[in-house]
From Swiss-Prot:
Gene Ontology cellular component terms for the protein in this record: chloroplast thylakoid membrane; mitochondrion; proton-transporting ATP synthase complex
KW Nucleotidyltransferase (keyword) present: no
Binding locations of ATP: G170, G171, A172, G173, V174, G175, K176, T177
Highest taxon, organism lineage: Eukaryota
GO biological process: proton motive force-driven mitochondrial ATP synthesis
Gene source species: Aneura mirabilis
UniProt cross-references to HAMAP family, sorted A to Z: ATP_synth_beta_bact (MF_01347)
Identification of the protein by name: ATP synthase subunit beta, plastid
Alphabetized InterPro entries for the sequence: AAA+_ATPase, ATP-synt_VA_C, ATP_synth_F1_bsu, ATPase_a/bsu_AS, ATPase_alpha/beta_chains, ATPase_F1/V1/A1_a/bsu_N, ATPase_F1/V1/A1_a/bsu_N_sf, ATPase_F1/V1/A1_a/bsu_nucl-bd
Keywords for the protein's UniProt record, in alphabetical order: ATP synthesis, ATP-binding, CF(1), Hydrogen ion transport, Ion transport, Membrane, Nucleotide-binding, Plastid, Translocase, Transport
Chief subcellular location: plastid
Recorded name of the encoding gene: atpB
EC id: 7.1.2.2
Membrane topology summary: Peripheral membrane protein
Entry-linked PANTHER family: ATP SYNTHASE, ATP SYNTHASE SUBUNIT BETA, MITOCHONDRIAL
Length: 492
């Protein structure tokens, strides 16, 4: 794999290779070329012409199959309305290329790398092909290191791996978007990194809401677009399956430039990885492949692996990926989520119960998991503190039924103490976010891992049993708890 992306765009060869459409079936086109002039698999083809109403047509498609008799089968990445047989098709001679570099920050792109935010064209100067090989073995960074987020519940209980892949599970309204925006903000401030957001097959309204919220929270700076911390790439659910299948690759290509050339740590968000699989399933059926288990494409494992293996740490930098995972009918054995799980290093589950209590971020400390939470990776102190927190919360959960009916008085002295500490831990796991300042009025807090461990050790040891529960709610480090308790007592 070449470290530096190509500095050339999708340039059209001097000798034009032109074919013509022989068949159109929805988003799938069959195109015939002259003998010996067949385009390669994944080459980008452009259909230009006029429809019957005299309107200009410009449709880009990607070669998927070579059929024989000088014919290829291609999948369109935009609507095929108005296309007719015998229209001319131009072979660009290369896969699609998209803009990369700092010029992409603060902008919204489609799958072809075209800006769709009405702020004019992107003057990137650099482009890179969306189909690239994963880094070779010798380029990989094999050292296991924690990616510190500054979010207490994540760093302590479900630490993220630098260059790892994290699954984000949660229904509507439990705080996925705010958590994503806080991570984007923190990687920029604490790590000097940038983020790329790939909206794969989700609702257009959600993409617009995210963009507006990012502008409001200054993750995207309207006044000075160059100071923005994120590039957005959208292929929404109203677009053809060819676009939805490739938008993840477009976002990843932009992220790879920041990793390989700028040598930065990058956060790549994919929302939703299930829609990537779904689009691949549609394309597979349209291409006439025999379906596999539950109707999915037979190439499911290969397609997922090709995308996921490009997301990794190299000796230059890292791409840490957070992927929202939709689980169809809550069936974790469905081939789409099951294939995704094989690639994940951690799972972050957002709980509606915690959100209802007003505890944000609403990360479920018992359901969320991480392969990094091992004593030989995070150290004995971190591991033992995390296990102590989990055991206390688990015991509190077991006692809920007794508390609900006979009440706290029926518990033993030891259990009452456990409940009191668990309630303090639960509140201390909440945290004010920088991106939520405009809504809450509370200044955001970045808490280092060292301070996080110290705070929870003090709660578990009983050093703070005398402080009121409310003092632990929506604060940063443990010193703020004592200060808040003093303020509340003086107010009383």
């Amino acid at each position: 794999m070449i470290n530096n992306p190509s500095l050339l765009g999708t340039s059209i060869p001097v000798t034009k290779n032109v074919g013509s459409i022989t068949q159109i079936i929805g988003p799938v086109l069959d195109i015939v070329f002259s003998p010996g002039k067949m385009p390669n698999i994944y080459n980008s083809l452009i259909v230009r012409g006029q429809n019957s109403a005299g309107q200009e047509i410009n449709v880009t498609c990607e070669v998927q199959q070579l059929l024989g008799n000088n014919e290829v089968r291609a999948v369109a990445t935009s609507a095929t309305d108005g296309l007719m047989r015998e229209m001319e098709v131009l072979d660009t001679g290369a896969p699609s290329s998209v803009p990369v570099g700092e010029a992409t920050l603060g902008r919204i792109f489609n799958v072809l790398g075209e800006a769709v935010d009405n702020l004019g064209p992107v003057d990137a100067g650099l482009t890179s092909p969306i189909h690239r090989a994963a880094p070779s073995f010798i380029q990989l960074d094999t050292k296991l290191s924690i990616f510190e987020t500054g979010i207490k519940v994540v760093d302590l209980l479900v630490p993220y791996r630098r260059g790892g892949k994290i699954g984000l599970f949660g229904g509507a309204g439990v705080g996925k978007t705010v958590l994503i925006m806080e991570l984007i903000n923190n990687i920029a401030k604490a790590h000097g990194g940038v983020s790329v957001f790939g909206g794969v097959g989700e609702r257009t309204r959600e993409g617009n809401d995210l963009y507006m919220e990012m502008k409001e929270s200054k993750v995207i700076n309207e006044q000075n677009i160059a100071e923005s911390k994120v590039a957005l790439v959208y292929g929404q659910m109203n677009e053809p399956p060819g676009a939805r299948m490739r938008v993840g690759s477009t976002a990843l290509t932009m992220a790879e430039y920041f990793r390989d050339v700028n040598k930065q740590d990058v956060l790549l968000f994919i929302d939703n990885i299930f829609r990537f699989v779904q689009a691949g399933s549609e394309v597979s059926a349209l291409l006439g492949r025999m379906p596999s288990a539950v109707g999915y494409q037979p190439t499911l494992g290969t397609e997922m692996g090709t995308l996921q293996e490009r997301i990794t740490s190299t000796k230059e930098g890292s791409i840490t990926s957070i992927q929202a995972v939709y689980v169809p009918a809550d069936d974790l054995t469905d081939p789409a989520p099951a294939t995704t799980f094989a690639h994940l290093d951690a799972t972050t589950v957002l709980s509606r119960g915690l959100a209802a209590k007003g505890i944000y971020p609403a990360v479920d400390p018992l359901d969320s998991t991480s392969t990094m939470l091992q004593p030989w990776i995070v150290g004995e102190e971190h591991y033992e503190t995390a296990q102590g927190v989990k055991q206390t919360l688990q015991r509190y959960k077991e006692l809920q039924d007794i508390i609900a009916i006979p009440g706290l008085d029926e518990l033993s002295e030891e259990d009452r103490l456990t409940v009191a500490r668990a309630r303090r831990i639960e509140r201390f796991l909440s945290q004010p976010f920088f991106v939520a300042e405009v809504f809450t009025g509370s200044p955001g807090k970045y808490v280092s891992l060292r301070e996080t461990i110290k705070g929870f050790q003090m709660i578990l040891a009983g050093e703070l049993d005398n402080l009121p529960e409310q003092a632990f709610y929506l604060v940063g480090n443990i010193d703020e708890v004592a200060a808040k308790a003093v303020v509340s007592q003086s107010g009383d």
